[in-house]
């Protein structure tokens, strides 16, 4: 990525005190979420970095993992060499269009939606082709590289480490209120 990095709408700089390293960010966010965040914007456009934006990236990336989990629960890890060419062609066209990753993401989310529909309707052959296609295309961008359960396990425990004092106090109060209600 070669665009400027903005932090909450301001250009990142040491003099403004809004400077951080990638290591700092990786202490709070899964590396694949950071990758998704960067890949989802055009490589020459400025990136507006914020915790909120990274949380949105986590939510978006999680949609792929949820779909993969739903497929795997129905059909296991089965993949086929046959790919849904319409999606592959649209993805490739977006990549040839000055690495238009915003458009590639639109293609991936449309494909993800079709995969979810096929899994829900239990059309095994179609679901397998769509799953195989989505795996292939996300792989090109280096996304959805982890075991589904490991990915979600990371968030369950990692995010608990970064609860604010206020969030911890809220959980304590909720527990206290629940005990008192019983």
Where are these regions (language model features)?
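Short coil/turn segments at secondary-structure boundaries
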Residues: 2, 37-38, 75-80, 104-107, ...
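Short acidic (Asp/Glu) and glycine-rich catalytic loops that position anionic groups and cofactors
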Residues: 5-6, 15-16, 36-45, 85-89, ...
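Non-catalytic interaction-recognition regions
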Residues: 31-33, 38-39, 96, 100, ...
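Helix-loop elements that line ligand-binding/catalytic pockets
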Residues: 47, 53-125
């Amino acid at each position: 990525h070669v665009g400027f990095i903005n932090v909450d709408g301001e250009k990142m700089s040491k003099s403004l005190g809004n400077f951080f390293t990638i290591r700092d960010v990786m202490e709070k966010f899964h590396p694949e979420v950071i990758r998704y965040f960067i890949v989802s914007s055009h490589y020459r456009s400025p990136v507006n970095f914020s915790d909120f934006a990274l949380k949105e990236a986590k939510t978006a990336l999680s949609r792929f993992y949820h779909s993969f989990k739903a497929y795997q629960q129905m059909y296991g890890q089965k993949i086929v060499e046959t790919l849904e060419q319409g999606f592959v062609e649209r993805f490739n066209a977006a990549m040839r269009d000055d690495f238009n990753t915003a458009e590639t993401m639109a293609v991936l989310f449309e494909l993800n939606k079709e995969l979810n529909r096929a899994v829900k309707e239990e059309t095994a052959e179609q679901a397998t082709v769509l799953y195989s296609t989505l795996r292939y295309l996300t792989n090109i961008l280096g996304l959805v590289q982890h075991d589904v359960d490991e990915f979600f396990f990371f968030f369950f425990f990692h995010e608990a480490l970064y609860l604010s004092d206020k969030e911890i106090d809220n959980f304590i109060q909720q527990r206290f209120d629940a005990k008192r209600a019983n």
